[in-house]
Amino acid sequence: MTDPFTSDGAKMPPKPFTIEEGRRQVRSFVLRQGRFTPAQQRTFDALWPRFGLDYLGAPRDLAATFGRDAHKVLEIGFGNGAALRFAAQQDPSRDYIGIEVHAPGVGRLLNALEEDGSTHVRLYHHDAVEVLEHEIADGALDEVRIYFPDPWHKKRHNKRRLIQPAFAQLLVRKLREGGRLHAATDWADYAEQMWDVLDATPGLVNRAGPRGHVERPTWRPQTHFETRGQKLGHGVWDLLYDRDSGIGNRESQEQLPSASG
């Protein structure tokens, strides 16, 4: 079957969403929504009722959404969906929620989920901050994954990065105690910012210790881009944080469950 989601099509103007932090607002990320071609729109319309979650702005009963009680894993900014699809294939005992603002990426994953016959994946085509603030109950998530968020590498654009103190505090609220946050980046400067923000966030404990990172976990597949970058000597930083009561010490880390999956 030909995948109609091979082109971004015409671009729509970026539309920022923000989260309050003190007196200023912090962007979560910029909406980069490509317009669908007619073929893409038909495919989207056919598959969205099966796999899509329309943003309603009200708390959602996730157990009812999936028809079962299971661990809930959220991936923010899933791109083309490769990591989310891989995780869902490898561990069908968990329920997966993906959020992505780029329309063709959502469409490609919809096609993949139909091909796999998935029943335990649901997708939002909306801003992550609004979904987290209004649709996900506090303590409802077992894990949050954020892989290779836009680095906004120009210094004047750093304020647009997703990982900011207010956003980290929001994630802590949504994770259950004992839950996990997994972030990955291939930009050294962004890794430094992630450490600055996440290591200082009450309720998060760095699995590798302060300013530490881990080897790529088995549940995150290595991308072609990542492989090419490593051949050129580029680094990749995987950061794992456990959600606890806010006591960030080595003893509390060692008592937490292992990071095997």
Swiss-Prot record:
The active site is at D150. It holds the Pfam family Methyltransf_4. Its EC number is 2.1.1.33. Coiled coil: none annotated. It comes from the Bacteria. It catalyses: guanosine(46) in tRNA + S-adenosyl-L-methionine = N(7)-methylguanosine(46) in tRNA + S-adenosyl-L-homocysteine. Pathway: tRNA modification; N(7)-methylguanine-tRNA biosynthesis. S-adenosyl-L-methionine binds at E75, E100, D127, D150. Residues 156-161 are annotated as: Interaction with RNA. This is tRNA (guanine-N(7)-)-methyltransferase. It comes from Xanthomonas axonopodis pv. citri (strain 306). The gene is trmB.
